[in-house]
């Protein structure tokens, strides 16, 4: 039975379909019946299903041909989602959804888009694909909320992770789809059927499957194309829609990164740009190290690599994805370069590299990016993960280098990558020397731009080969050697790098290669080689333990072997007649290196920097050479060299060879040194080469001549007898050769050195008492020649050539040093006295050079050394001490040395042979005569010179005294005068110049060391007393006294010079160890003098080292003080203390060890009463805080902050700046410490810091302190994150207060003085600035972490701030915080919403409109989280305010609040619509004052009303009861304005509802009429207007008699009463209202009405024609306007009130007509217009013009009167509006006359007048008037 019914129903539907003729009918039937018809498919009856199918087939044909027909998609979607529906139904339903959805208007599609997503859940894959295919094009048109929040999101995807994934996958395929792609499936089907036997897979991805687009599988392409493929333009829109969808954050950012990357590579500009911009904006938010993002990128890049799945099944061919196109790859790789994770992901990383370098579709851009990726892997991939990659990367790079030669830049990158790989994985390269060779070869052959990269790569690879052994090392030697001789400079440079780094520093063959390179012509090659060769071995034991230089014999033999080999080959070097094995530069370097090896083997630190330093090591080298010479067998045994060729002899041979060929000072020195240290064996070899030596003595270089002369003297000293005599004679002769000054100079020196050596030997012989008799016969002759030689030398002292004079002086000094001068003591001629005086006179002479003076002083000092009975010793010493000159410091050190030597005489160390004995080893000969005058010298210095009034003398004396103490430390005289010497030094400590002070301090240190224990105690106490009390030596002032030295002016004369020593002394006293002051003085070595040759001779560095060791136990007390002193503003103290620090604190961890102590000291001294200490403490603190873990001193942080805040306000600027510096550093450190990674330490730091920064920092009166505190808080909030949560209740209110406190006060001042409008703009800008301030930024950071645990404490403080907070920023900020809280933690906030509401209420009535708006805005959000009861109370409060309070501020706050609720919490408003919307309705009728903001308020109320009602009419119907109640209340208000507002609202109700029904009509009218009673008040007009509106709208309802509803009569009575009021303005409205009521009710009250109106018209006419009153012009103007208005109103009202009553008309028609006609002739155009309109109404209702009331005579009279006056208007040329209105009156008359057939009443006179006037209008400038006039004229003419 049921299925018969079904079939009947289906038949009926069929029938209806058949009858549907229009599209509209068809659409209606489909909308109604399609869903139920589809449901019938679930029928079990075959017949029913069959019938349905027939119906659907018919339907499909009809629908497909009519694209405009809409389908009931919404209903179908609901049906599709029905879980109970059978699949048969859903399968058909989706067909119609697919057909209907694209036909919908775009807005409707957007509305249904979320439903499509919901419908997808749990459906089969093809249907899901179809739905997504429908959805994607819609995304382009979707509108998303500006602020993304889950509640406002159109797609609520958060709960649908599976749907999101499906959608994202589909979107990815859409983005990958190229434009214009066609899937040729028909061909593929044939293929698949033909090749179904073979299952081999081909490049197409499977048998017979067409090639999908790059990055897609066949299936993906097919589903994107779908049933209706998109055109390229549609596809572009789809892609843009997807990008918009992602932009709107509809899906998690993480999931959509890949989509944006792919979209950014799109071929269409619009898509690529949109995606690019979005990617850039999210760049900082995306975590590129997220494995999910990176794996997706790799998967898309590489496609599905054919790997078998775990089960062993291969991926279906149609599902296999191809790799993406090169264009997409070029976009993916730059993002991989950002990611550390990408570099670690194996094997994808290597697959991408190989694809980019060698893939089939790669290009140079992709290759470049792939190489960058290789660099990225080398830099960031961790050790464990790079291991398996290394060999593959290296293979790839070498393959690229070998095969790809087109792009030099690319090659450069490849080479560079090889270098980087070698530094990461050296073991890969160590065994592969061939690779080095390959790169060296490439360096020879490649383009110049590539060479730099190869050079860099090779330099990086060096480290990989430093462990080579055996054959590998030999191979590398050969390789380096072969490339060292290549023509390309870069090749040689790299070869040097290899030679120096790959081999150890004692590896002879590589050193030899470097020596050859040192002779390279290019600076970059030889410079590097020299740097390596001259790098000195370490001084400490640990370093020296490893053999760092080759042994001297081995190196010599190797060089000799190479030299002899080279002499036989073309590489030898020719210079003039000489042939050398090496070029001069290389040879020079070789001999210097051999000298370094010699020194190293001799056990001293090798140096090749200065000859003087080298000479200091000569005795040690001498011992080694002697040992080497004596054990020649041992050296020969290591190789098969003949025993005669001793290494030393080979060495001297090489030196001689180079010296003969090229020369050179260092070479000369090396030869001289070798011979001098062992003359017995080595000098004898050169006796036959004296001529060659002489040639060297006449060299053009002075130093060369000096060294050659020394060499000559050593050689000559080995001969004796006649040979010696002849050699000396030759020299004497040569000195007289005036043609060559060089020869003279060399001979003079040689003569001096030779005589000196002769005397020294003689002295030794005499001492040893050897056979004097045997030599006696030769002696007299020799003595004679010696004397002769001395006199010859003496004769040159007065030479005009300074060169020869200096040489003579030097020669005499050498003779005097070695023995008594062989000349008379006194008398005439060249005597010792003459010599002394001559030399002494030269010292102060201005003619002499400094060099001459130096030599003269040295020579004078030597005379008593060689001569134990030198007669003029004291004269000489006195002369030296008297020769003081200003600014001759170096000279004073020389004098000091000379005085020391001369004072001790023969016991002086100057008497030794410097080549054989060091100063320390020298012991004076036992038999020498003693000529020690030290007591006398000491006495003269202490009692005369040191207390001289001349500061230069004092300084010189101090230097001499230091020299005496240093050199004669063991002398009993010095030891017995320690106190006097100390006093002398102390007196100099207070000198104004630094050098004197420094010399004195060094002297004091030495004196202390020399005393015994008792001496030391006395010395300490004296020194401390002198320093601390500042007692000074009084200097007598004579006429010659120099008061200020040059540069002394401007220095404090109050002993400021002592400040450094006072500090040192107080430092020692604080340690209870006053004697430490000496140690400090020794360490405080800060004068440059001590670095000079003369200063270094004192050896203070050794003393300092010892002092450092002695001070070590006091480090705990010293370190804090010294640390601070290093930053002292006084340069002297700073340098001294830094010197002490560097000497004592050698271990860098010392500061960390004593961190607490240092910190304590610094904090204490930050507030010292001395500015110097405060400043140094700040600077020290700044330095201390940097880069140190401060976890142990967290408790000290507040103290540091607070103290530095105080110092920031210091009286001294430099201290303030130092404090600022320290604070900035402290801020940075604290921010780092507040990182969540620090755990508990971070939490502790925040806990101690916040109170300090909030209470002390932000509230500080110092601007800089406040700024820094805020800055620090902002940074802490960024880094601390969730750790801020417990502190939020304190932090947030404090920051909110600061928003106002920190605002410039001038803004408040300006705001108070501004106009209302300016104030609003300005305050808005202020609040906006506050909201974007760092404080607000910090607050917003904190808000993220708030929850119920914190709110309890925070809310009361927040409420307090809102109520009592001062300042715009604070109050606005509070409101902003509340808004944030409602979004961050809505549920947690609910219990506190009531409190916050009541607090915000106080803000709503704030005088400042900006605060008011902020609070309203906050309230709008807050109601969302509050309880209903709280919201109701709020709304009642607002209602009360609005109705009862007159102040505008309350009205405004109500409007703002309700508007905010409507906008931000619409659901809340809907729930309370009955309370809110009536108020809104009333509010929107507020009478707006243009000047005030009421217009804005009206708009807000209107918006609230319109947004929340279903159309205004519907809204009024819905809330009619409430609306009437509130308007009644308004009418009963005491406020006139509110009454008027209520009236307007009532009028609006009646207008919009068109007809009110009882009891509402009665209620409204009663209320209005009640309001009418009484006197006139401003706005009362509105009541009248409302009455008119109500009566007009509800006239039919008023006819019925209803209890409690005023009758028409009562209403008219009340209104007419109001028309009698005196107030003209009000009267006009009342008359208009009465007229409207009369017109609506059709009542006849014309008699009463005309009695009111006609006098008004007549009065007006009289006044307007009468004389003007004497009132002011503008008042007159206003009055005239009002009268005009009343006149117009009166005429209009008469027209409206003209009744349909024949009796009344009979009474008044004549009078009224006459009145109008009169006014028509006399009035202005405005009045004419009004009269004409009234006339129109008059004739419209004139019953005379109707047949049944005809009275031809009366009518004729009226018409004549009318025609006479209307001609004026018809002929009014100026105003077309007047002509138009007049024409319409004439037209009406003619029409009425025609209808009533009363033409006879229109007399000929009338017709004539009218025709005449109409004729003038035929030329009217307005065509429509012209035409109408013409028609009317013809009508009239036809009557005649």
UniProtKB/Swiss-Prot annotation:
Belongs to the ECM29 family. InterPro entries: ARM-like, ARM-type_fold, ARM_ECM29, Ecm29_N, HEAT_ECM29. This is Proteasome adapter and scaffold protein ECM29. Residues 187-212 are annotated as: Disordered. Residues 187-202 have a biased composition (Low complexity). The modification Phosphoserine is found at residue 825. GO terms for biological process: ERAD pathway; proteasome assembly. Pfam families: ARM_ECM29, ARM_ECM29_C, ECM29_N, HEAT_ECM29. Adapter/scaffolding protein that binds to the 26S proteasome, motor proteins and other compartment specific proteins. May couple the proteasome to different compartments including endosome, endoplasmic reticulum and centrosome. May play a role in ERAD and other enhanced proteolysis. Promotes proteasome dissociation under oxidative stress. One of its GO terms (molecular function) is proteasome binding. HEAT repeats lie at residues 28-65, 107-144, 162-206, 327-363, 388-427, 430-467, 470-508, 684-721, 722-760, 784-821, 830-869, 871-908, 932-970, 976-1013, 1014-1051, 1113-1150, 1153-1190, 1195-1232, 1244-1282, 1286-1324, 1349-1387, 1391-1428, 1518-1555, 1559-1596, 1606-1643, 1647-1684, 1780-1823. Keywords: Cytoplasm, Cytoplasmic vesicle, Cytoskeleton, Endoplasmic reticulum, Endosome, Isopeptide bond, Nucleus, Phosphoprotein, Proteasome, Repeat, Ubl conjugation. It comes from Mus musculus. Disruption phenotype: Deficient mice are viable, fertile, and do not show any histological abnormalities. Under stressed condition, 26S proteasome dissociates in wild-type cells, but not in cells from deficient mice.
């Amino acid at each position: 039975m049921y299925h018969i019914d079904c079939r009947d129903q289906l038949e009926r539907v069929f029938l209806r379909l058949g009858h549907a003729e229009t599209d509209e009918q068809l659409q209606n039937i489909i909308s109604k019946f399609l869903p139920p018809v589809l449901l019938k498919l679930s029928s079990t009856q075959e017949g029913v299903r069959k019938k349905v199918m027939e119906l659907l087939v018919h339907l499909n044909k009809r629908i497909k041909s009519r694209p405009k027909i809409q389908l009931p998609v919404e209903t179908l979607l609901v049906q599709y989602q029905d879980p109970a529906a059978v699949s048969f139904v859903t399968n058909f339903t989706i067909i119609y959804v697919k057909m209907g959805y694209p036909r919908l208007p775009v807005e409707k599609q957007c509305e249904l888009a979320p439903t499509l997503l919901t419908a997808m859940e749990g459906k089969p894959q093809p249907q899901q694909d179809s739905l997504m295919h429908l959805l994607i094009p819609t995304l382009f048109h979707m509108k998303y909320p500006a602020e993304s929040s889950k509640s406002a999101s159109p797609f609520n995807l958060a709960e649908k992770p599976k749907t999101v994934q499906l959608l994202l996958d589909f979107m990815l395929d859409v983005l990958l789809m190229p434009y214009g792609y066609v899937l040729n499936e028909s061909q593929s089907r044939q293929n698949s059927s033909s090749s179904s036997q073979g299952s081999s897979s081909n490049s197409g991805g499977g048998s017979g499957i067409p090639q999908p687009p790059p990055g897609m599988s066949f299936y993906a392409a097919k589903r994107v194309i779908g049933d209706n493929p998109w055109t390229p333009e549609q596809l572009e829109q789809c892609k843009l829609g997807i990008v918009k969808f992602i932009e709107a954050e509809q899906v998690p950012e993480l999931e959509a990164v890949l989509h944006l990357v792919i979209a950014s590579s799109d071929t269409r500009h619009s898509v690529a740009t949109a995606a690019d911009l979005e990617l850039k904006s999210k760049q900082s938010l995306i975590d590129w190290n997220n494995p999910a993002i990176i794996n997706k990128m790799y998967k898309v890049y590489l496609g599905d690599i054919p790997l078998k799945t775990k089960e062993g099944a291969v991926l279906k061919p149609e599902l296999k994805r191809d790799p993406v196109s090169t264009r997409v790859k070029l976009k993916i790789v730059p993002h991989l370069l950002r990611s550390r994770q990408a570099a670690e992901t194996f094997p994808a990383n290597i697959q991408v590299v190989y694809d980019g370098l060698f893939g089939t579709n790669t290009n140079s851009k992709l290759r470049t990016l792939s190489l960058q990726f290789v660099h990225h892997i080398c830099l960031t991939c961790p050790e464990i993960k790079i291991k398996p990659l290394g060999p593959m990367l290296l293979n790839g790079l070498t393959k690229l280098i070998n095969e790809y030669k087109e792009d030099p830049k690319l090659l450069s990158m490849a080479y560079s990558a090889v270098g980087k790989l070698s530094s990461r994985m050296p073991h890969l390269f160590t065994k592969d020397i061939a690779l080095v060779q390959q790169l060296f070869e490439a360096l020879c052959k490649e383009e110049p731009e590539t060479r730099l990269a190869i050079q860099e790569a090779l330099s990086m690879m060096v480290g990989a080969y430093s462990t080579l052994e055996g054959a590998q090392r030999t191979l590398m030697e050969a390789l380096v050697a072969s490339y060292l001789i290549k023509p390309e400079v870069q090749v040689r440079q790299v070869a040097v790098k290899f030679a120096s780094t790959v081999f150890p520093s004692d590896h002879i063959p590589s050193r030899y290669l470097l020596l050859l390179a040192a002779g390279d012509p290019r600076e970059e090659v030889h410079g590097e080689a020299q740097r390596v060769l001259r790098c000195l071995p370490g001084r400490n034991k640990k370093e020296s333990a490893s053999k760092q230089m080759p042994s001297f014999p081995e190196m010599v033999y190797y060089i000799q072997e190479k030299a002899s080999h080279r002499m036989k080959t073309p590489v030898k070097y020719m210079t003039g007649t000489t042939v050398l094995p090496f070029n001069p530069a290389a040879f020079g370097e070789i001999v210097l290196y051999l000298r370094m090896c010699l020194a190293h083997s001799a056990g001293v630190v090798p140096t090749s920097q200065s000859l003087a330093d080298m000479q200091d090591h000569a005795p040690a080298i001498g011992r080694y050479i002697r040992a080497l010479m004596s054990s020649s067998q041992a050296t020969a045994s290591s190789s098969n060299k003949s025993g005669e060729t001793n290494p030393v002899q080979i060495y001297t041979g090489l030196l001689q060879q180079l010296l003969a060929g090229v020369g050179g000072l260092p070479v000369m020195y090396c030869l001289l040194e070798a011979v001098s240290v062992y003359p017995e064996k080595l000098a004898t070899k050169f006796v036959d080469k004296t001529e060659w030596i002489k040639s060297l003595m006449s060299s053009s270089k002075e130093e060369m001549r000096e060294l050659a002369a020394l060499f000559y003297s050593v050689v000559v000293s080995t001969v004796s007898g006649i040979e010696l005599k002849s050699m000396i004679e030759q020299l004497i002769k040569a000195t007289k050769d005036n043609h060559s000054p060089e020869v003279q100079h060399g001979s003079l020196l040689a003569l001096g050195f030779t005589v000196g050596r002769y005397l020294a030997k003689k002295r030794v012989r005499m001492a040893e008492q050897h056979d004097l008799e045997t030599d006696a016969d030769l002696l007299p002759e020799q003595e004679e020649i010696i004397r002769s030689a001395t006199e010859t030398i003496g004769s040159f002292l007065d030479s005009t050539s300074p060169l020869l004079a200096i040489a003579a002086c030097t020669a005499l000094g050498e003779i005097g040093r070695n023995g008594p001068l062989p000349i008379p003591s006194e008398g005439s001629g060249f005597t010792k006295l003459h010599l002394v005086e001559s030399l002494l006179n030269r010292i102060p002479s201005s003619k002499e050079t400094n060099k001459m003076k130096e030599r003269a002083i040295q020579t004078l000092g030597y005379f008593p050394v060689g001569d134990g009975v030198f007669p003029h010793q004291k004269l000489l010493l006195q002369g030296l001490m008297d020769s003081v000159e200003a600014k001759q410091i170096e000279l004073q050190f020389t004098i000091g040395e000379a005085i020391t030597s001369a004072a001790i005489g023969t016991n002086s160390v100057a008497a030794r042979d410097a080549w054989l004995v060091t100063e320390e080893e020298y012991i004076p000969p036992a038999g020498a005569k003693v000529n020690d005058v030290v007591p006398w010298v000491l006495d003269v210095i202490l009692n005369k010179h040191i207390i001289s009034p001349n500061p230069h003398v004092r300084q010189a004396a101090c230097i001499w005294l230091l020299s005496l103490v240093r050199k004669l430390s063991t002398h009993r005289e010095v030891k017995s005068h320690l106190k006097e010497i100390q006093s002398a030094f102390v007196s100099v400590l207070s000198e104004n110049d630094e050098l004197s002070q420094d010399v004195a301090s060094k002297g004091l240190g030495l004196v202390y060391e020399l005393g015994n224990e008792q001496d030391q105690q006395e010395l300490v106490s004296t020194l401390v007393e002198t320093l601390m009390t500042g007692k000074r030596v009084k200097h007598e002032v004579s006429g010659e006294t120099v008061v200020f030295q040059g540069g002394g002016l401007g220095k404090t004369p109050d002993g400021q010079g002592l400040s450094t020593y006072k500090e040192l002394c107080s430092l020692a006293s604080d340690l209870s160890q006053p004697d430490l002051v000496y140690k400090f003085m020794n360490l405080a070595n800060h004068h440059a003098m001590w670095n000079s040759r003369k200063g270094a001779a004192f050896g203070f560095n050794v003393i300092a080292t010892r002092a450092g060791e002695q001070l070590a136990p006091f480090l705990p007390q010293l370190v804090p003080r010294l640390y601070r002193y290093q930053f002292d503003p006084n340069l002297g103290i700073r340098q001294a203390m830094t010197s002490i620090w560097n000497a004592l604190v050698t271990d860098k961890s010392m500061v960390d060890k004593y961190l607490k102590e240092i910190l304590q000291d610094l904090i204490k001294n930050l507030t010292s009463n001395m500015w110097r200490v405060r400043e140094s403490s700040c600077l020290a603190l700044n330095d201390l805080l940097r880069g140190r873990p401060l976890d142990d001193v967290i408790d000290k942080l507040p103290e540091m902050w607070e103290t530095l805040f105080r110092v920031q306000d210091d009286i001294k600027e430099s201290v303030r700046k130092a404090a600022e510096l320290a604070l900035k550093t402290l801020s940075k450190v604290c921010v780092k410490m507040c990182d969540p990674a620090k755990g508990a330490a971070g939490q502790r730091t925040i806990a101690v810091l916040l109170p300090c920064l909030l209470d002390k920092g932000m509230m500080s009166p110092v601007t800089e302190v406040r700024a820094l505190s805020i800055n620090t808080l902002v940074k802490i909030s960024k880094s601390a994150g969730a750790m801020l949560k417990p502190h939020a209740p304190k932090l947030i209110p404090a920051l909110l207060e600061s928003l106002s406190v920190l605002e410039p006060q001038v803004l408040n001042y300006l705001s108070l003085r501004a106009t209302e409008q300016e104030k609003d703009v300005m305050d808005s800008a202020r609040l906006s600035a506050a909201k974007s301030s760092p404080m607000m930024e910090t607050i917003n950071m904190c808000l993220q972490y708030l929850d119920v645990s914190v709110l309890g404490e925070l809310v009361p403080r927040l409420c307090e701030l809102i109520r009592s907070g001062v300042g715009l920023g604070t109050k606005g900020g509070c409101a902003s915080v509340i808004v944030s809280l409602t979004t961050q933690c809505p549920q947690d906030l609910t219990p506190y919403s009531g409190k916050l509401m009541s607090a915000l209420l106080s803000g709503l009535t704030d005088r400042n409109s900006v605060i008011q708006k902020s609070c309203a805005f906050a309230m709008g959000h807050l109601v969302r989280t509050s309880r209903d009861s709280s919201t109701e109370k709020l709304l009642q409060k607002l209602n009360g305010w609005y109705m009862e309070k007159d102040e505008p501020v309350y009205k405004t706050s109500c409007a703002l609040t309700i508007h905010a609720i409507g906008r931000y919490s619409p659901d809340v408003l809907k729930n309370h619509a009955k309370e809110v919307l009536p108020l809104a309705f009333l509010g929107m009728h507020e009478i707006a004052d243009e000047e005030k903001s009421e217009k804005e308020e009206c708009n807000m109320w209107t918006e609230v009303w319109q947004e929340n009602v279903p159309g205004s009419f519907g809204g009024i119907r819905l809330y009619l009861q409430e609306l009437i109640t509130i308007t009644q209340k308004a009418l009963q208000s005491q406020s006139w304005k509110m009454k008027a507002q209520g009236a307007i609202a009532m009028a609006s109700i009646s207008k919009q509802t068109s007809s009110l029904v009882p009891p509402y009509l009665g209620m409204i009218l009663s209320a209005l009429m009640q309001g009418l009673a009484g006197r006139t008040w401003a706005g009362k007009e509105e009541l009248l207007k409302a009455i008119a509106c109500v009566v007009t709208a509800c006239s039919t309802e008023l006819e019925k008699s209803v209890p409690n509803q005023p009758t028409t009569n009562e209403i008219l009575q009340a209104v007419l009463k109001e028309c009698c009021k005196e107030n003209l303005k009000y009267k006009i409205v009342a008359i208009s209202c009465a007229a409207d009521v009369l017109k609506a009710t059709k009542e006849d009250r014309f008699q009463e009405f005309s009695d009111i109106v006609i006098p008004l018209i007549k009065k007006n006419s009289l006044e307007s024609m009468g004389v003007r009153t004497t009132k002011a012009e503008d008042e007159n103007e206003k009055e005239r306007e009002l009268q005009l208005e009343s006149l117009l109103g009166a005429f209009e009202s008469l027209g409206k009130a003209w009744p349909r009553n024949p009796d009344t008309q009979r009474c008044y028609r004549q009078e009224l007509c006459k009145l109008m006609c009169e006014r028509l002739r006399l009035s202005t155009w405005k009045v004419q217009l009004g009269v004409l309109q009234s006339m129109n109404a008059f004739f419209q209702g004139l019953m005379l013009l109707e047949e049944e009331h005809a009275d031809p005579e009366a009518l004729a009279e009226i018409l004549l009167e009318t025609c006479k006056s209307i001609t004026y208007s018809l002929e009014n040329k100026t105003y077309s509006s007047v002509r138009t209105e007049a024409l319409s009156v004439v037209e009406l008359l003619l029409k009425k006359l025609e209808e009533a057939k009363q033409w006879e009443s229109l007399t000929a006179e009338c017709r004539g007048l009218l025709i005449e006037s109409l004729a003038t209008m035929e030329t009217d400038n307005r065509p429509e008037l012209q035409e109408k006039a013409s028609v009317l004229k013809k009508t009239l003419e036809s009557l005649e």
